[in-house]
C-alpha cells in the first residue's frame, strides 16, 4: 500500500468529569474501526486547525465550541500506509443541541473509564500528558499495522516502552509506555543487580559482606532520595535481561563488567502504590536479580546524576536490620534482600 499523509483534528470535549467519546462502528475501511476516539476529522482546503476543529465538532455532534485549548500535534503512523498529523484539542465550553453522528455512537464517558475502552494504546499516552497538564507537545506514535505500538517519542525524544506480562511472567504481546504502565499498574520486567564485597569475618569465622546501595536522585518519579539496589532498571520492549543488567550498570554507575561477573539469583515479584509529585504511582514488576561479588574499583564509578545522587557501602546484616526496622530511608523489598544473603 502506498503511504500517504493527512492533516486532521481530534477533540476531547469535557463536561462533569466526562469526555464525549465516539465509538467508530460505521465505516468498513476505517483505520479507527471499532475504536473509541474523540471527535474531529480531516482538514478541508485552506482551513486552519481551529477552523477545522469548529466545523468538525459542529458536524459530528451538533455543538458549537465556545472554549477550547490546543494541546499538541500527534504524528500517527499506522504501519499499514497511513500517516496522519493530528491536531489535538480539548474543549470545556460549548452550546447548542446534540445531534446524531453518522460515523458511530456518541457517549459521555467518565474520564477514568475511558482508559478501559477499546482505544489505541498510544492514546493513553496523550491522555496522560493532558491529565498532567504538560505544555504544548509533539507526540509521535508508530504502530505495526496490526494495532500494536512499536515506538513513541515526545518532543523528539524516545519514550520508554515495556513488554507487558501475564501473571505467569510470559509476554502478553502488549507494548505500553512507561508512564502509562505505572499509572495502570501493568506487570512488566526489570533487572536488579546487587554489588557486594567481603568485609572480613565475625565470630565463628563466618564471612561478612558489605553491600553497595545507591541513593536515588531527588528528581526520580518514585521514591526520590531513598536508598535502593546497587543498580536497577526497566527492560525496554524486546530487551534480554542479562544485557539490560549490563547496560544499567554502565549507565547508572559507569561500571563495565562481563556477563560472567553477574551471578543470577532468581526472580522477584514486587508491587506497591504510593503518591509521588502529586500523582499516584503504581509499580508492578517482575525482577531478574543478579549479584556481583567481583572487586570493583570505586574510583572508576561515574554516577548518572539524573538517576543516582550518591552510593554507600553498608554491612549486609546492619542493612538488613535497618530495612526491617525502617530506620533506613529505602525502597528495597526485604524478601529480595534476603535472596541476596542466601
Where are these regions (language model features)?
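Conserved Nudix-box catalytic region and its N-terminal flanking loop in Nudix hydrolases
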Residues: 19-59, 145-155, 180-191, 203-247, ...
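Short, well-structured hydrophobic secondary-structure segments
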Residues: 44-82, 192-195
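Active-site segment of metal-dependent pyrophosphate-handling enzymes
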Residues: 62-97, 111, 208, 218, ...
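Residue-level signal for well-ordered, solvent-exposed loop/turn and beta-edge residues enriched
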Residues: 18, 69, 148, 168-170, ...
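Nudix hydrolase/Nudix homology domain
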Residues: 101-159, 179, 225, 266-277, ...
Amino acid at each position: 500500500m502506498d503511504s500517504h499523509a493527512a492533516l486532521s483534528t481530534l477533540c476531547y470535549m469535557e463536561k462533569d468529569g466526562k469526555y464525549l467519546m465516539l465509538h467508530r462502528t460505521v465505516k468498513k475501511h476505517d483505520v479507527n474501526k471499532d475504536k473509541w476516539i474523540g471527535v474531529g476529522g480531516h482538514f478541508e482546503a485552506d482551513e486552519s486547525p481551529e477552523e477545522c476543529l469548529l466545523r468538525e465538532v459542529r458536524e459530528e455532534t451538533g455543538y458549537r465550541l465556545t472554549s477550547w485549548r490546543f494541546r499538541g500535534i500527534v504524528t500517527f503512523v499506522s504501519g499499514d500506509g497511513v500517516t496522519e498529523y493530528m491536531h489535538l484539542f480539548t474543549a470545556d465550553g460549548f452550546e447548542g443541541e446534540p445531534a446524531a453522528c453518522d460515523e458511530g455512537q456518541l457517549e459521555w464517558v467518565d474520564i477514568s473509564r475511558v482508559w478501559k475502552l477499546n482505544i489505541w494504546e498510544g492514546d493513553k499516552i496523550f491522555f496522560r500528558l493532558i491529565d498532567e497538564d504538560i505544555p504544548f507537545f509533539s507526540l509521535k506514535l508508530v504502530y505495526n499495522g496490526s494495532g500494536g505500538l512499536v515506538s513513541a517519542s515526545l518532543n523528539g525524544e524516545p519514550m520508554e516502552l515495556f513488554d507487558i506480562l501475564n501473571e505467569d511472567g510470559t509476554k502478553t504481546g502488549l507494548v505500553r509506555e512507561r508512564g502509562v504502565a505505572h499509572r495502570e499498574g501493568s506487570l512488566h520486567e526489570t533487572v536488579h543487580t546487587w554489588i557486594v564485597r567481603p568485609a572480613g569475618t565475625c565470630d565463628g569465622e563466618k564471612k561478612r559482606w558489605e553491600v553497595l546501595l545507591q541513593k536515588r536522585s531527588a528528581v526520580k518519579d518514585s521514591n526520590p532520595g531513598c536508598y535502593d539496589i546497587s543498580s536497577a532498571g526497566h527492560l525496554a520492549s524486546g530487551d534480554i535481561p542479562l544485557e539490560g543488567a549490563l547496560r544499567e550498570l554502565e549507565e547508572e554507575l559507569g561500571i563495565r563488567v562481563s556477563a560472567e561477573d553477574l551471578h543470577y539469583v532468581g526472580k522477584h515479584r514486587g508491587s506497591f502504590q504510593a503518591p509521588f509529585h502529586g500523582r499516584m504511582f503504581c509499580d508492578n514488576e517482575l525482577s531478574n536479580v543478579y549479584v556481583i561479588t567481583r572487586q570493583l574499583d570505586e574510583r572508576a564509578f561515574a554516577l548518572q546524576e539524573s538517576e543516582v545522587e550518591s552510593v554507600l557501602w553498608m554491612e549486609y546484616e546492619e542493612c538488613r536490620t535497618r530495612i526491617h526496622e525502617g530506620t533506613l530511608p529505602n525502597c528495597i523489598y526485604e524478601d529480595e534482600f534476603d535472596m541476596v544473603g542466601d
